[in-house]
UniProtKB/Swiss-Prot annotation:
Keywords: Ribonucleoprotein, Ribosomal protein. Belongs to the bacterial ribosomal protein bL19 family. Residues 108-135 are annotated as: Disordered. Residues 108-117 have a biased composition (Basic and acidic residues). The gene is rplS. One of its GO terms (molecular function) is structural constituent of ribosome. It comes from Nitrosospira multiformis (strain ATCC 25196 / NCIMB 11849 / C 71). It comes from the Bacteria. PANTHER family: LARGE RIBOSOMAL SUBUNIT PROTEIN BL19M, RIBOSOMAL PROTEIN L19. This is Large ribosomal subunit protein bL19. Signal peptide: none annotated. One of its GO terms (cellular component) is cytosolic large ribosomal subunit. GO terms for biological process: translation. This protein is located at the 30S-50S ribosomal subunit interface and may play a role in the structure and function of the aminoacyl-tRNA binding site. PROSITE patterns: RIBOSOMAL_L19.
Length: 135
């Protein structure tokens, strides 16, 4: 690890932000701090993550939503002080890292399948076979 990476990792730990582990295809709610005149409020921006850029302190992600029939994309810096919180609403099952093809689609063709959690019975059976193999 070079000096710049070390400084960035120290800065990330100093910020103490808890960023959930999300990926492209996930539906997230980003709570953004907005200043209007002398008032400060939190604005929720809900949409699908279409891209994620992992660059340490300079990491960013792009969220797309359809508002009044128009597609709106917004790019957020992951460690920005303007982001109050990030909440994952739904996990999406996609096979691409960048979902830019969603820009050309609308309606049913723009839907993303939901990633279902592994069944408990399947996990128990898998754990049981691993224990018998180790014995």
């Amino acid at each position: 690890m070079n000096l710049i990476e070390q400084l960035e990792s120290e800065e990330i730990s100093r910020l103490g932000k808890t960023i959930p582990d999300f990926a492209p295809g996930d539906t997230v709610v980003v709570n953004v701090k907005v200043v209007e005149g002398d008032r400060k409020r939190i604005q929720a921006y809900e949409g699908t993550v279409i891209a994620k850029r992992n660059r340490g302190l300079n990491s960013a992600f792009t969220v797309r939503k359809v508002s009044s029939g128009e597609g709106v994309e917004r790019t957020f810096q992951t460690y920005s002080p303007l982001i109050a919180s990030i909440e994952i609403k739904r996990r999406g099952a996609v096979r691409r890292a960048k979902l830019y093809y969603l820009r050309d689609r609308s309606g049913k063709s723009a839907r993303i399948r939901e990633k279902l959690p592994a069944r408990a019975s399947a996990r128990k059976a898998e754990n049981g076979t691993q224990k018998t193999e180790q014995a």
